Amino acid sequence: MTLEELRKEVFTAMQSKKPSWYRKGQFVFNYIDFEYGVARAVQFDDGIDCFYVDENIDAFLEACVKRINQK
């Protein structure tokens, strides 16, 4: 999987599934956690948190791609 493929998947899902009270980073984190199970490893092991810090979404997705491709 490439970064662009994951980004497209996540942002497409965000358009139809994100609750209005979620920030973008919350949705990205929860989506990745549910679909791929790597969000917590990226947050805690890699130290990249987009759940609380929306500005980290790009770095978070990059780290997720690396972990997804290692599976």
For every predicted segment, state its role.
Residues M1-F29:
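N-terminal acidic leader/helix
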Residues L3-L6, F34, L61:
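Generic detector of leucine side chains in alpha-helical contexts
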Residues T12-K17, F34-V38, R67-Q70:
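Surface-exposed polar/charged interaction patches
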Residues K18-D58:
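Acidic, low-complexity, intrinsically disordered interaction modules
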Residues Y52-K71:
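Charged low-complexity stretches with an acidic bias
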